[in-house]
Amino acid sequence: MARVKRGVTTHARHKKVLKLAKGYRGRSSKCYRIALERVEKALRYAYRDRRNRKRDFRGLWIQRINAGARLHGLTYSKFMHGLKRAGIEVDRKVLSDIAAREPESFKALVEQAQKALAA
């Protein structure tokens, strides 16, 4: 039976890792063993940060909504509670966009929330 030589698969694997390491500094983009460590760590960071990005954006949206609501005399939590009581179901992403780009529309939403809280 013929001996199995794995030069082709090894070369392909090395090429794949070095391609992923393109742009890294120094030997991190030239040497397979070093590149492999850097690529694995980069992939771990990418996996972790895809999840963290969702948290970060939600926090950013909440900060923007809070800033917009406080301009009109409401805190974030009271504003959101007022919207819920008024039956207005708009998600935080859209609310933050409205607060940043359309202050007049956001003011109308704040007034609706205040009415619902007063009732």
UniProtKB/Swiss-Prot annotation:
Q: Which residues cross the membrane?
A: none
Q: Name one GO molecular function term.
A: structural constituent of ribosome
Q: One Pfam family from the UniProt entry?
A: Ribosomal_L20
Cellular component aspect of the GO annotation: ribonucleoprotein complex; ribosome
Disulfide bonds, paired cysteine numbers: none
What CDD domains does the entry give? Ribosomal_L20
GO biological process, any: ribosomal large subunit assembly
Q: Which UniProt keywords apply?
A: Ribonucleoprotein, Ribosomal protein, RNA-binding, rRNA-binding
Q: Which residues form a coiled coil?
A: none
Q: Which NCBIfam families match?
A: rplT_bact (TIGR01032)
Q: Tell me, in a sentence or two, what this protein's role is.
A: Binds directly to 23S ribosomal RNA and is necessary for the in vitro assembly process of the 50S ribosomal subunit. It is not involved in the protein synthesizing functions of that subunit.
Q: Which PANTHER family match?
A: 39S RIBOSOMAL PROTEIN L20 (PTHR10986)
What family does the Swiss-Prot or TrEMBL record give for this protein? Belongs to the bacterial ribosomal protein bL20 family.
Protein name (record): Large ribosomal subunit protein bL20
- The scientific name of the source species is Rhodospirillum centenum (strain ATCC 51521 / SW)
